[in-house]
């Protein structure tokens, strides 16, 4: 299975259709059904009340994700003072999450409700690829943001990344993600599967070279787990732990101790939230997909589709959590959001001039007094 598993494995759908309860205590093979009967999946996702809950859950995530990520992108484009290197990375994260909202969730919900692939052969190849691409860009960008903060705060580097370099990094993130996601487009098969005579379903499944139970699928899943979860989580956790330690041990001038203490607390909370959200949201889905590839009997679970869907919903919650963590928890973004709603374009020029002037004076005085440098100020503002 791919790194996102946007559609539940069609093999499990086929297995469930082959054998279905026909009465208390026994089952009837599909080949013995009455002539006018039609196969139906007997899992919880076919219950109307469950479908209503799933529709509400997915629609809520789509709405929150589209609004939140669109706002982040909008304020970075609209306000000149927001066009910093870190904010470019955050905007790129918002673009990737926005693609996840628009490309992952609607198709996953459609498949879950309908039980088969209804989007045609072209989208059978393109949709999983686009989904994998968006998720990988999002993960790489989260890692880049952590490394950028670590570089500026822990090592006090005076030479910051230029905007040109930041765009190059963003381009590389998309290029690497496009390459890593390519197997999801190449190794796919759009086909009709006959369940019983005169009844077929449309399937869009992974088709790896070699035998039916190819090792390639398992290798790809293990690689995806390592590249998209284990390695990024390790880098992000290490970077933010170093940042937290640096902020904790930094000594501020006596007059501003309370001010910087409060800002450190806010920064620490945000850093912890970033790591926890990433770890908790993606672990169930990655682990479940890996279990499917290692042991195909997982597909025989009666509630396979429901379990998969719940884990997928948990993972997708990160798409609206990211703009909250990187945007709304930041005072500059909050002001920009409010200004955008009020259409106060003039505030941008004023904010830019005043903030740069006051910041320069404050940093000059702080440096003379042995106070905090610019990297610590930025640490609580990114």
UniProtKB/Swiss-Prot annotation:
Keywords: Cell membrane, Disulfide bond, G-protein coupled receptor, Glycoprotein, Lipoprotein, Membrane, Palmitate, Receptor, Transducer, Transmembrane, Transmembrane helix. It is found in: Cell membrane. It is a multi-pass membrane protein. InterPro entries: GPCR_Rhodpsn, GPCR_Rhodpsn_7TM, NPY2_rcpt, NPY_rcpt. It comes from the Eukaryota. Residues 68-87, 147-166, 239-269, 327-382 are cytoplasmic. Disulfide bonds join 124-204. Its main location: membrane. The chain crosses the membrane at residues 47-67, 88-108, 126-146, 167-187, 218-238, 270-290, 306-326. Residues 1-39, 363-382 are annotated as: Disordered. Glycans are attached at residue 11. A lipid is attached at residue 343 (S-palmitoyl cysteine). GO terms for cellular component: plasma membrane. PROSITE patterns: G_PROTEIN_RECEP_F1_1, G_PROTEIN_RECEP_F1_2. The keyword Cell membrane applies. Residues 1-46, 109-125, 188-217, 291-305 are extracellular. One of its GO terms (molecular function) is neuropeptide Y receptor activity. Belongs to the G-protein coupled receptor 1 family. Receptor for neuropeptide Y and peptide YY. This is Neuropeptide Y receptor type 2. It comes from Sus scrofa (Pig).
